[in-house]
């Protein structure tokens, strides 16, 4: 990437209906002792080709929210809509990539792993599924490993297979739950770069979960900041001006520090001051 990728923000979009709308969603789960609220009245919208990041500390409900968008958990309050239709169950229009890449069946080759959901869902016949699998393996740089087995791949290569498998289904939105968290720092940076290059070529819609401020600024063009448990919306900021080349720069570091203050400062006045210092035109604050 020779220049920052110019994503779009809410301020310059002209669509009337968002691709995904999360409207006042609260989520709960049960423990042996009690019912725990994971998120409280969270709202946001995602438009086509957005790289939207859910950012917050561990335990703030990011992953729970992602699973609810995928259709695995029903909100106890509010609703989630995809293209105006209420989300009530899982579907091939929302594909999830987790950080555990051992989700790849070890007895299937790389190509067979990518083909599997296409065949299982009867989306395509075998010949068409093979063609599409090879197409997306080429996109992620693994065409030469189509006949390899998962145990022969590195962690980064397994991540690429998981991404190729997800994109081969051509979902309306790709959901990624801290997909690079288990990788070493160098591989993680490489995967971030490859994800952005792939987005530049394919322009898929991405919802990305992370607890890393730096990763959020690099990957996203918009970031939703969630408070510590239970997750509430602290702010939404635009971040399309940053990319991997911004790491270590003064503006990048200052923005990361101010986002940290927004996430963790319980004083609403201090949080509002940090938001003002960010200088983004499309920032939204909620306390």
Residue ranges and their predicted role:
Residues 30-32, 74, 115-128, 139-140:
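ABC-type ATPase nucleotide-binding domains, specifically the catalytic core motifs of the NBD
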Residues 70:
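Helix-to-loop junction immediately C-terminal to a conserved catalytic motif
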Residues 78-90:
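Conserved ABC transporter NBD signature motif
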Residues 107-116:
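Short coil-to-helix segment of the ABC ATPase nucleotide-binding domain corresponding to the Q-loop/switch region
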Residues 126-145, 197:
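Conserved ABC ATPase "signature" region
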Residues 149-153, 157:
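Conserved ABC ATPase signature
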Residues 170:
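Conserved catalytic motifs of ABC-family nucleotide-binding domains
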């Amino acid at each position: 990437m020779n220049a920052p990728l110019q994503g779009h923000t809410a301020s310059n979009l002209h669509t009337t209906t968002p691709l995904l709308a999360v409207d006042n969603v609260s989520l709960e789960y049960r423990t042996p002792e009690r019912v725990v609220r994971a998120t409280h009245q969270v709202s946001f919208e995602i438009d086509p080709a957005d790289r939207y990041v859910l950012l917050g500390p561990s335990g703030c409900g990011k992953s729970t929210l992602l699973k609810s968008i995928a259709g695995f958990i029903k909100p106890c309050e509010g609703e989630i809509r995809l293209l105006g239709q209420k989300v009530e169950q899982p579907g091939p229009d929302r594909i999830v990539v987790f950080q555990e890449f051992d989700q790849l069946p070890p007895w299937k080759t790389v190509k067979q792993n990518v083909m599997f959901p296409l065949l299982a869902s009867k989306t395509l016949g075998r010949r068409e599924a093979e063609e599409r699998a090879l197409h997306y393996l080429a996109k992620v740089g693994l065409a030469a490993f189509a006949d390899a087995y998962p145990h022969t791949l590195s962690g980064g290569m397994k991540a690429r297979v998981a991404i190729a498998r997800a994109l081969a289904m051509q979902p309306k939105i790709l959901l990624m739950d801290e997909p690079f968290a288990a990788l070493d720092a160098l591989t993680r940076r490489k995967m971030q770069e490859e994800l952005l290059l792939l987005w530049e070529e394919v322009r898929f819609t991405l919802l990305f979960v992370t607890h890393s401020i730096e990763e959020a600024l690099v990957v996203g063009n918009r970031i939703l900041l969630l408070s510590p448990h239970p997750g509430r919306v602290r702010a939404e900021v635009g971040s399309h001006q940053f990319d991997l080349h911004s790491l270590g720069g003064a503006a990048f570091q200052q923005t990361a520090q101010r986002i940290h203050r927004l996430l963790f400062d319980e004083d609403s006045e201090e949080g509002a001051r940090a938001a003002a210092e960010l200088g983004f035109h499309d920032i939204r604050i909620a306390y």
